[in-house]
Amino acid sequence: MKAIVFAYHDIGCVGLNALAEAGYDIQAVFTHTDNPGENRFFSSVARVAADLALPVFAPEDVNHPLWVERIRELQPDIIFSFYYRNMLSDEILSLAPQGGFNLHGSLLPQYRGRAPINWVLVNGETETGVTLHQMVKKADAGPIAGQYKVAISDVDTALTLHAKMRDAAQELLRNLLPRMKEGPLPLTPQKEADASYFGRRTAADGEIHWQKSAFTINNLVRAVTEPYPGAFSYLGQRKLTIWRSRPLDLVHNKLPGTVLSTAPLTVACGEGALEIITGQGEAGLYVQGDRLAQEMGIVTDVRLGNKPSNTLKRRTRVLILGVNGFIGNHLTERLLQDDRYEVYGLDIGSDAISRFLGNPAFHFVEGDISIHSEWIEYHIKKCDVILPLVAIATPIEYTRNPLRVFELDFEENLKIVRDCVKYNKRIVFPSTSEVYGMCDDKEFDEDTSRLIVGPINKQRWIYSVSKQLLDRVIWAYGVKEGLKFTLFRPFNWMGPRLDNLDAARIGSSRAITQLILNLVEGSPIKLVDGGAQKRCFTDIHDGIEALFRIIENRDGCCDGQIINIGNPTNEASIRELAEMLLTSFENHELRDHFPPFAGFKDIESSAYYGKGYQDVEYRTPSIKNARRILHWQPEIAMQQTVTETLDFFLRAAVIEKTAAPKDELNA
C-alpha cells in the first residue's frame, strides 16, 4: 500500500518507523524545518527519513497547488499525519482512496487542538492517550480507528508524559497499521457533545496566578517544566522560574503569593500552599528552593506576583449593577482577589457586600437603577467592562408581576445597553437558560438551538422573551455599530448567599432556598407537579470562574460570543434535589435547632405559581463554547454545593432565631 507521510516531532519518528516496519510503500515524507527559537528536545523526522532512504520535503505551504499536483502524481493509497503542525486541505486528502489518518495526542473527542499533553497536566487529568482517527475538514473531529490509554501519575511532567505517549503511539500503530493494509477498519464516530478544544500555549501562559489553589499551580509547573520555558512569577521586577514543586494542604491566613517560609521555600496560594523544590533566578543557576531564596533575597512575608509595570498601569474598572445580588457579590469577591481590577457597584442593599466596603478597590453606592440613571451613565463612561446584573429572575414573579418583569428586565437594561453603545464600552450581559424555553434539543446549543416559548396567555414566558429580545438587540448593535459584547447564560447556579429566607417566605426565591425554608420552619416541602422537572445545577464557584475568564477576555476570545455556563453532569430533578437536601439536613450539626421534617407535598403548578405558568421537563446545556473559548470545565459535585448552601442558610437561621425578641420567640 502506497503511503504519503506528514510528520514531525518524536511521534512523527515513531509513526514513520512503524509504517516502515509494517511494510508500507512510503512514497514521500513531508516535515518542517527546524525552528531556531524552539528548544528541540525531540528526534528529527528528516534524519529518520534519510536513514530509511526516503524522499523528504519541508515546503512552506504544502497545500499550494504545485505541491498538491506533485502528491497527485505519487498516487497514494493512504495518507498519514503524525504530529504534523499544519492542516491538510480537502484537496490533498481526496487524493488517497483510503483517506487520511492523523495520530492525535489525546483520547478524542477530549482535548482537540494544540498542546494536548501540556493541557491535560494543566487541568489535572489522571488519564490521557493517543488516538488514530480519519481526517475530516474540522480539526481532530473525524471518526476513530483506535485508541491507547495512558495513565498520568501525580509526578508526571510534560517530558515524562511525552515519553509515555511515544510508547503508547508505538503500541497503537503496531496493532492498527498491519490491519489497515488488509482493508478499511471499522471507524467509530466521535461524540460531539463530549468534545473539548484547546488552543496553542505560549511561554507567557506559564505565569503563576497565586490566587489559584496549590494543586492547580503545581499542575501548571508540571505542565511547563523543562524542556518547556517553565512556570514563573516575579519578586518585584525580578523573574523567578519554578521547575519542581509540591502542593501542601496547609491552612493559612496570608494573601496569595505571600512567602510563608524560606526553608523550605513555601508560598501561600488561594487554597493551600506551594513548596518550591527547585527553581532559577533570571540570571542564576538551577538550584534548590532554599538556595533560590538566599540568592534572590526572598524573606518571609514578601509577596510574589505579577511583574510591576514601569509605567503605572490602571486597573480595569468593572461596573456591576446589582452588585449585592447572588452573582454580583461572588463576582466582586473574585475580582478583588486580583490586583488588576477595580469594582464599582450599585444596588438597593449592601448586606451581602458589607465585607468589601473597606477595600480601596471597591466603590459602592446604594441606589436603584430606575432612579440613578445619571450616576449609571457617568460610570458606564468611566468604566471598562459593564455587567448589568439587575433583574427579576424568580419564576413566581413572571406570573405575579409580568409588567414589572418587563420594565426592569428589558426597559431599564436597554438603557444600559444603549449607553454602552454611546460610550463604546464592553458589555458582559447575563442572558439566561430560560431563553431556550421549551427547546426540544437534548442539549441546548448557543449557536444552533431553537428558542421555543409558549402562547401569549402563558405569562411566565415574559422573562424569557425579555431576555431573548435584549440578546438580539445586543447582537444587532455588535454587528451594526461595533458594540463589544459577550452574552453568558447561567444554568441554575447555586451556593451560599443565593436569595435569603425572607424572600422565600413571600415565595420570591429560587427552588433550593424555598426547600430550605420548608425544612427550617417545619412545613411540608412543596413539590410543584411532583418535582419531576430536571435541571443541571452549577456551583457558584464554578460559574464565577467562567464569568471571571469572560471578563478577562484574553486576546479578545470572548468578543461577540454566547456562552452557556452550566454543569451537565449535575443533572437532577427537583425531587432529587429535595431528597439530597433532606439527607444533609438530618445529618447537620445544627439539626436540633429546627422542627421535625413535615414530609413532601405534591402541588400543581397553577396552584403554586398562579394562572399562566408553564414549565419545561429538562434544561441541559451544551458547554462546548465554554470549554473551547474559556478552557473551562465545571468541577464541583452537586452534593458539595447542596451541603455548603444548606450550611449557610441554617447558620443564618440560627443567628436570626438568637437575635429575635423574646416575645416573638414565645408567640
From Swiss-Prot:
The keyword ATP-binding does not apply. Residues 1-304 are annotated as: Formyltransferase ArnAFT. It comes from the Bacteria. (6R)-10-formyltetrahydrofolate binds at residues 114, 136-140. Homohexamer, formed by a dimer of trimers. Transmembrane segments: none annotated. In the N-terminal section; belongs to the Fmt family. UDP-L-Ara4N formyltransferase subfamily. It catalyses: UDP-alpha-D-glucuronate + NAD(+) = UDP-beta-L-threo-pentopyranos-4-ulose + CO2 + NADH; UDP-4-amino-4-deoxy-beta-L-arabinose + (6R)-10-formyltetrahydrofolate = UDP-4-deoxy-4-formamido-beta-L-arabinose + (6S)-5,6,7,8-tetrahydrofolate + H(+). This is Bifunctional polymyxin resistance protein ArnA. The lineage of its organism: Bacteria, Pseudomonadati, Pseudomonadota, Gammaproteobacteria, Enterobacterales. GO terms for biological process: lipid A biosynthetic process; lipopolysaccharide biosynthetic process; response to antibiotic. UDP-alpha-D-glucuronate binds at residues 393, 398, 432-433, 460, 492, 526-535, 613. Induction: Activated by low magnesium concentrations, via the two-component regulatory system PhoP/PhoQ. The record marks 140 as: Raises pKa of active site His. GO terms for molecular function: carboxy-lyase activity; UDP-4-amino-4-deoxy-L-arabinose formyltransferase activity; UDP-glucuronate dehydrogenase activity. NAD(+) binds at residues 347, 368-369. The gene is arnA. Bifunctional enzyme that catalyzes the oxidative decarboxylation of UDP-glucuronic acid (UDP-GlcUA) to UDP-4-keto-arabinose (UDP-Ara4O) and the addition of a formyl group to UDP-4-amino-4-deoxy-L-arabinose (UDP-L-Ara4N) to form UDP-L-4-formamido-arabinose (UDP-L-Ara4FN). The modified arabinose is attached to lipid A and is required for resistance to polymyxin and cationic antimicrobial peptides. Keywords: Antibiotic resistance, Lipid A biosynthesis, Lipid biosynthesis, Lipid metabolism, Lipopolysaccharide biosynthesis, Multifunctional enzyme, NAD, Oxidoreductase, Transferase.
